[in-house]
A protein has these predicted regions:
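Cytoplasmic-entry segments and transmembrane alpha-helices of multi-pass inner-membrane transporters
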Residues: 1-7, 11, 114-150, 244-246
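Alpha-helical transmembrane segments of integral membrane proteins
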Residues: 2-3, 94-127, 156, 173-325
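Helix-terminus/capping and membrane-interface signal
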Residues: 12-22, 100, 300
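Hydrophobic alpha-helical transmembrane segments of membrane transport/permease proteins
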Residues: 15-65, 158-180
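Membrane-water interface segments at the C-terminal ends of transmembrane alpha-helices
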Residues: 22-29, 58, 67-69, 134-165, ...
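Short hydrophobic, aromatic-rich alpha-helical segments embedded in or entering the lipid bilayer
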Residues: 42-75, 220, 268-280
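Membrane-interfacial helix-loop-helix junctions in multi-pass membrane proteins
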Residues: 52-60, 77-86, 168-188, 281-287
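An internal, D/E-rich "acidic patch" concept
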Residues: 57-113
Length: 325
């Protein structure tokens, strides 16, 4: 176990270094931040002073070396727009995005899992055709279009839910979240559902495939021969066997929910990482964009490691070292 973790940490360090080089190189090819920071009518001396203050007058390799040495000590630079450390802004906005992604994942599991099991147990029924057709639709609908339609229907026409924002934040056991207040719940329902739609479709398809595969196995036939009820078979024999691959996939997909919440957060003005990054891209705020991308890469690396360990714990047939005992 320790050897595996150590090896994965070393691999992660290499991946982070390569990604930092790629991200820093690509972001330096996109526009000049000074154009966004100064008045177009400013004198050349003023423009040069701003460029010098932010270290943009130095060669790219010098800028990258300073960034790399700073990153090793947790300093990813200061935001050009906010004048604050980029990493502190990321950490400050992360709880809102984490809350949104977690709520979206819960919605995806609560809706997708039972529908997928039903579709797997009734492969030729009309209900299954409707469910699977809807899952294809859920994968195909653009997130931004669905978000706008939800706002028009549930906020503008019906007036049931607020258009934007995070709402009132409550506290429970020292954890602050908008889901602990009624106003916060009303604010999170639409953006979380919008973010969860694609994952609902994915969970349905994963669960259906797993259910159909497991129901053909001998131990299920034996359970039926013993006279066990369908509900008991599903609860004690089907679920434990289909949850392992679903959990491992969803752990990685949780990272994608955080990484790709950008569109949803922009539509619903959710004060998380996505909105911060969109504003940073518009203003060519390089430190924020670089810090965000490296933060997401680190998150994915951690999730991958955790998934591998969980998978080995849940399934004794799996060995982290790649060998069987």
């Amino acid at each position: 176990m320790l050897a595996f973790v150590f090896r994965r940490v070393l691999q992660s360090v290499v991946v982070l270094f390569v990604m930092s080089l790629i991200v820093f190189s690509m972001i330096n090819l996109v526009g000049d931040p000074v154009d966004m920071l100064v008045n177009p009518e400013s004198l050349p001396d003023e423009i040069e002073r701003v460029r010098r203050d932010f270290g943009l007058d130095q060669p790219a390799y010098v800028q990258y070396w300073k960034f790399l040495t700073g990153a090793l000590s947790g300093d990813l630079g200061n935001s050009f727009v906010f004048g604050r450390p980029a990493l502190s802004l990321i950490v400050e906005r992360f709880p809102a995005t984490l809350e949104l992604a977690t709520f979206a994942l819960i919605i995806a599991i609560m809706i997708g899992l039972p529908l997928g099991i039903y579709a797997g147990l009734n492969p030729s029924g009309w209900g299954t055709r409707i469910i699977m057709g809807s899952s294809i639709l859920g994968i195909s609908i653009p997130t931004f279009w669905l978000g706008l339609m939800m706002i028009i229907v549930f906020s503008v026409l019906l007036g049931w839910l607020p258009v934007s924002g995070r709402g009132e934040i409550g506290s429970f056991l020292g954890i602050e979240s908008s889901v602990f207040t009624l106003d916060g719940l009303r604010h999170i329902i639409m953006p979380a559902t919008n973010l969860a739609l694609f994952k609902i479709a994915m969970v349905i398809r994963l669960t259906r495939a797993g259910t159909e595969e497991v129901m053909r196995l001998d131990f299920i036939k034996f359970a039926r021969a013993r006279g066990l009820s369908p509900r008991r078979i599903v609860r004690f024999h089907l679920l434990p066997n289909i949850l392992i691959p679903i959990i491992t996939v969803l752990a990685i997909e949780f990272g994608t929910l955080i990484a790709f919440a950008t569109v949803t957060e922009s539509i619903f003005a959710w004060p998380g990482l996505g909105k911060l990054v969109i504003d940073a891209i518009i203003n060519l705020d390089r430190p924020i964009v670089v810090a965000y991308l490296l933060f997401v890469v680190t998150l994915f690396l951690i999730l991958n490691l955790v998934v591998d360990i969980i998978y080995a714990v849940l399934d004794p047939r799996v060995r982290l070292g790649g060998s069987e005992k």
